[in-house]
């Protein structure tokens, strides 16, 4: 066994909260731009992630930073780290 205890870098992404109807869980929409293979035009692609929100602090429209964690349920393996900007009320 080696004594190398290198820490694995956790994936962190930013996205917008689109649903907070579940208890302690929010749905975060993460958008990215990819270049089309043939035409070279940049296209928006999006992914919806379920993230753990322990304090139920996030509202719809908030921009949040989430990080990857060990699976908490079938679909939830992200955790809200911070709320970057709050939604206008």
UniProtKB/Swiss-Prot annotation:
Disulfide bonds: none annotated. Keywords: Ribonucleoprotein, Ribosomal protein, RNA-binding, rRNA-binding. GO terms for biological process: translation. GO terms for molecular function: rRNA binding; structural constituent of ribosome. GO terms for cellular component: cytosolic small ribosomal subunit. Gene3D superfamilies: Nucleic acid-binding proteins (2.40.50.140). It comes from the Bacteria. Belongs to the universal ribosomal protein uS17 family. Part of the 30S ribosomal subunit. One of the primary rRNA binding proteins, it binds specifically to the 5'-end of 16S ribosomal RNA. This is Small ribosomal subunit protein uS17. The gene is rpsQ.
């Amino acid at each position: 066994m080696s004594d190398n205890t290198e820490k694995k870098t956790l994936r962190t992404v930013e996205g917008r909260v689109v649903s907070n109807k579940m208890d302690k869980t929010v749905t975060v929409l993460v958008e990215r731009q990819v270049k089309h293979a043939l035409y070279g035009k940049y296209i928006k692609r999006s992914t919806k992630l379920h993230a753990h929100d322990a304090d139920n602090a996030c509202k719809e429209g908030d921009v949040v930073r989430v990080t990857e964690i060990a699976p908490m349920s079938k679909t939830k393996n992200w955790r809200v780290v911070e709320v970057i900007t709050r939604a206008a009320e």
